[in-house]
A protein has these predicted regions:
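A short, N-terminal "cap"/entry segment at the start of jelly-roll beta-barrel domains
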Residues: 1-34, 118-121
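Glycine- and acidic-residue-biased ligand/ion/polar-headgroup-sensing regions
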Residues: 55-66, 71
Length: 121
């Protein structure tokens, strides 16, 4: 029995805002609820509504910049930087810049629409 899993066909999450989301591990691909790993590309001028997720989220920026508003504090990360945002913290993710932002997001437990608690726009 193999002690590893290679993912070469991630689930591409349907979106309406131009953002690419490829879930490699998590609820949609491997039915794992303890962790999700996703590769994402946020287009220029993209943003999500504020949310208060019930999961920790780790983000690593591959290229470009990503803006976070965490409890009213604005933070901008660039390529090579990372952040951990603890669960039950109000946050907004965005890319208000002129170039796309590519990054990896890891959520524990796994990302789920039932746990994200997005505010109405």
């Amino acid at each position: 029995m193999k002690k590893y899993t290679i993912q070469n066909s991630p689930f591409v999450v349907p979106t309406t805002d131009g953002k690419l989301i490829e879930e490699h591990f998590g609820n949609a691909t491997t039915k794992q609820s303890d962790i999700s790993v996703a590769h994402m590309v946020a287009p220029p001028k993209w943003k999500e509504p504020f949310q208060t997720p019930q999961f920790d989220e780790y983000t690593y920026i591959i290229r470009g910049k990503k803006q976070f508003i965490i409890d009213d504090e604005k933070i901008v990360l660039s390529a090579g930087e990372s952040i951990k945002i603890e669960k039950n913290v109000r946050v907004q993710y965005s890319n208000p810049f002129d170039e796309e932002c590519e990054y990896i997001a890891i959520c524990t437990p796994a990302f789920s629409m039932d746990l994200v608690n997005r505010e109405e726009a």
